[in-house]
Amino acid sequence: MKKVLKISLIVFFIMTIIVAIIGVIFITNIMNETKNVTFDKNKIISATKQINVYSDNGELVENTSVDGKKIVPLSDLKDDTINCFLSIEDKNFYKHNGVNYKRIAKAMLNNIKSHSFKEGASTISQQLIKNTHLSNEKTLKRKVKEIVLTKKLEKAFTKDEILETYLNVIYFGDGCYGIEEASNHYFNKPAKELNLIESATLAGLIKAPSIYSPTKDYES
C-alpha cells in the first residue's frame, strides 16, 4: 500500500512539473508575441480593418471593412449615453484594471450550470482588444493573449481614452462602426444629441446587433 502511494505521489509530482513547464512555455510564447504591440488611439480608430460578422450558429452573415471615422470625444457625449453603455457592458469599468476576474468566475459558473457558453465576461477593455487586435477564434491562446494585451492597454491609456476609443470602433450592426455612425444611421442625429432611450437602444445592440437592430423586420 505504501509503495502504491509512493508511486502515485511521484507520478503526481512529475505530472505537476510537466504541466508547469508547459504553462511557462505557453505564457512565454504569448509574452514574446505581444511584447512589441503598442497602442495609438488615433491609429486604432482610423485604421481599416476587415471584420467578419457571424450569426449565433457561427455562420458568416457579413464581411465588411471599417474605414477611418470621425472621432467623437467622450466629453461630447451626454452622461446618460455614457452610463447606458457602462451599465450594459461593464458596470465596474472604472474600478477594475482591465480584467474583471470576479465576473469571469461568475460567468464560468453560470455556463457550467447551463451546459452552454451563453454568458460572456469580457470587460470594455477586453472587447476593444478583441475587436481591434485579435481574431474571433475561441481558443485558450487567444483568450490569454487578450488578457495580456488588455493589461498593456490599461497601462498605455487612461480609462476615458479606452472608453472613447471603444465607442468609436465598436460594431452596432447594419454596417455601422462607432457611435457617431450608428447614431446617424438609426436616429438621424449626431451622437451628442442622443436621448436616454436612444442611448440604451444603441448600447443594447452591441451584444447581438443582428438580432436587436431597430431596422429589423420582426414580423417577417
Where are these regions (language model features)?
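Juxtamembrane regions of bacterial inner-membrane/periplasmic proteins
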Residues: 2-220
